[in-house]
Amino acid sequence: VSNSSSQIILKWKPPSDPNGNITHYLVFWERQAEDSELFELDYCLKGLKLPSRTWSPPFESEDSQKHNQSEYEDSAGECCSCPKTDSQILKELEESSFRKTFEDYLHNVVFVPRKTSSGTGAEDPRPSRKRRSLGDVGNVTVAVPTVAAFPNTSSTSTPTSPEEHRPFEKVVNKESLVISGLRHFTGYRIELQACNQDTPEERCSVAAYV
């Protein structure tokens, strides 16, 4: 449960089949990385619009009114249909309006205008890759580099950064915890372990992810 923009109230139940007496719980939490697509998206595009929640009644043309009237006249001789209530009509209008708004939003997001070419200011419909003929490809010789086998030489590898220290909390005699100091609008992965001894760490259960 989110208590505020920087706190989470975590509650859990004890294991249904505990392996021994549960003495304490270990809670770890780790901030998740942001999606790269959120940074690549240009939010200043004119065509990018968010769907509006304002409701506007749909416009019904005269042709559709005549069509509905003719269908009603044809079916009037056979059977009588129950009229729709005001709530049913309002619900259908809201669904139709929401569907149109959502479709407009999809068109604005998916169909993004092509970037303009440098200098002219007009849209460049041509593809960016240059077309090559098969003759050009057949006359090209590619040299594949090989690595010489020197016994005293080792390849230089990129140094890996050490694992970031994950904050954790030891919870005793209760099944809840308030995690503070969190970043708003950010995803966190929370791990929970049930333990029956302080040491060693192998006395804890498999982590449950939240």
From Swiss-Prot:
The record ties this protein, via InterPro entries, to: FN3_dom, FN3_sf, Ig-like_fold
Provide the residues annotated with a glycan attachment (glycosylation): 3, 21, 68, 139, 152
Keyword field: ATP-binding, Cell membrane, Cleavage on pair of basic residues, Disulfide bond, Endosome, Glycoprotein, Kinase, Lysosome, Membrane, Nucleotide-binding, Receptor, Repeat, S-nitrosylation, Transferase, Tyrosine-protein kinase
Q: Where is the signal peptide?
A: none
GO annotation, cellular component aspect: late endosome; lysosome; plasma membrane
Annotated spans, Disordered: 55-78, 116-169
* Subcellular location field: Cell membrane; Late endosome; Lysosome
From its record, what is one biological process in GO terms? insulin receptor signaling pathway
Q: What intrachain disulfides are recorded?
A: 195-204
Q: Where is the composition biased (Low complexity)?
A: 137-161
In residue numbers, the region (Insulin-binding) covers 103-111
* Annotated catalysed reactions: L-tyrosyl-[protein] + ATP = O-phospho-L-tyrosyl-[protein] + ADP + H(+)
What EC identifiers does the entry list?
Answer: 2.7.10.1
What membrane topology is annotated for this entry?
Answer: Single-pass type I membrane protein
UniProt modification remark: After being transported from the endoplasmic reticulum to the Golgi apparatus, the single glycosylated precursor is further glycosylated and then cleaved, followed by its transport to the plasma membrane. Autophosphorylated on tyrosine residues in response to insulin. Dephosphorylated by PTPN1, PTPRE and PTPRF. Dephosphorylated by PTPN2; down-regulates insulin-induced signaling.
Question: Which branch of life, at top level?
Answer: Eukaryota
What the record says about activity regulation is: Activated in response to insulin. Autophosphorylation activates the kinase activity. PTPN1, PTPRE and PTPRF dephosphorylate important tyrosine residues, thereby reducing INSR activity. Inhibited by ENPP1. GRB10 and GRB14 inhibit the catalytic activity of the INSR, they block access of substrates to the activated receptor. SOCS1 and SOCS3 act as negative regulators of INSR activity, they bind to the activated INRS and interfere with the phosphorylation of INSR substrates.
Domain Fibronectin type-III, first and last residues per copy = 1-96
Gene Ontology MF annotations? ATP binding; insulin binding; insulin receptor activity; insulin receptor substrate binding; phosphatidylinositol 3-kinase binding
* SUBUNIT field: Tetramer of 2 alpha and 2 beta chains linked by disulfide bonds. The alpha chains carry the insulin-binding regions, while the beta chains carry the kinase domain. Forms a hybrid receptor with IGF1R, the hybrid is a tetramer consisting of 1 alpha chain and 1 beta chain of INSR and 1 alpha chain and 1 beta chain of IGF1R. Interacts with SORBS1 but dissociates from it following insulin stimulation. Binds SH2B2. Activated form of INSR interacts (via phosphorylated Tyrosine) with the PTB/PID domains of IRS1 and SHC1.
Q: Describe the function of this protein.
A: Receptor tyrosine kinase which mediates the pleiotropic actions of insulin. Binding of insulin leads to phosphorylation of several intracellular substrates, including, insulin receptor substrates (IRS1, 2, 3, 4), SHC, GAB1, CBL and other signaling intermediates. Each of these phosphorylated proteins serve as docking proteins for other signaling proteins that contain Src-homology-2 domains (SH2 domain) that specifically recognize different phosphotyrosine residues, including the p85 regulatory subunit of PI3K and SHP2.
Domain comment? The tetrameric insulin receptor binds insulin via non-identical regions from two alpha chains, primarily via the C-terminal region of the first INSR alpha chain.
Give the protein family.
Belongs to the protein kinase superfamily. Tyr protein kinase family. Insulin receptor subfamily.
**Protein name from the UniProt record:** Insulin receptor
Q: Which organism is it from?
A: Macaca mulatta
